[in-house]
Amino acid sequence: MAVYAVGDLQGCLEPLQCLLEHVHFNPEQDRLWLVGDLVNRGPQSLETLRYLYSLRESLVCVLGNHDLHLLAVARKKELLKKGDTLLEILEAPDRDDLLGWVRRQKLMHYDAQRNVAMVHAGIAPQWTLKKALKHAAEVEHALQDEQLYGAFLDGMYGNEPTRWDNDLQGVTRLRVITNYFTRMRFCTSDGKLDLKSKEGVGTAIPGYAPWFSHQSRKTRDVKIIFGHWAALEGRCDEPDVFALDSGCVWGGSMTLLNVDTLERHQCNCDAMGNAADGLVTRVQPGATPLP
């Protein structure tokens, strides 16, 4: 059995299918891990979600900020933003099945056999693996609890508070947890977030650094797969941290990682997020991914 992890899809179905065909993905035997941001901005959000739903028995997903935004706009359509490509999902006859499936996905996945964690954006540097899983479960519970669901989605938007505190409660607590797992790029060593900076690692403001680069990070004994940060172009200097968002929806590429061999494959994308030429490039373990 092979386990493949793929970076942000954002409604770009063609490159995903090219990658899976290239590695001869067999849903009866293999497993597909997805780092979140399954939908939005790309040309085929509805088709992508339907395709993933058809593979759900072979699939492990964690939620990204765009997936949570989808759930929020499904409740309140006025939250739709310019550039969102979610309306087709909201008007689809099978929307309840698709949205219900999204709602049941995790914020963090951990494979104990491989000692590999998967998240969308990152793990707060001050959290141990055990604490990270616990805090992810708090949000997962809110997503699946009818009494908490609406209040969580209504209150999840926002950049404050910028730092974790064990005494945080209610929606404020859930918002901070969500921001770490789905929006974080730069932070201080004790986890104070900068949610405005979105460019490459060299653009950090003084006192801040990429979440994965802090020497005091408490998950250094765990391999971590993440997406979200397209400006990294799939590059990360940390030996056990694997960045998979290579900017497919922006005309970059979509990246697939064999979780066991660490071999990468990349499919070139055009400016619309479609497979540019059907070309898939194999990148050896330890090699620098394509820009």
From Swiss-Prot:
It is an enzyme of class 3 (hydrolase). This is Bis(5'-nucleosyl)-tetraphosphatase, symmetrical. It comes from Pseudomonas syringae pv. syringae (strain B728a). It catalyses: P(1),P(4)-bis(5'-adenosyl) tetraphosphate + H2O = 2 ADP + 2 H(+). Hydrolyzes diadenosine 5',5'''-P1,P4-tetraphosphate to yield ADP. Belongs to the Ap4A hydrolase family. Its EC number is 3.6.1.41. Keywords: Hydrolase. GO terms for molecular function: bis(5'-nucleosyl)-tetraphosphatase (symmetrical) activity. InterPro entries: ApaH, Calcineurin-like_PHP_ApaH, Metallo-depent_PP-like. HAMAP family: ApaH.
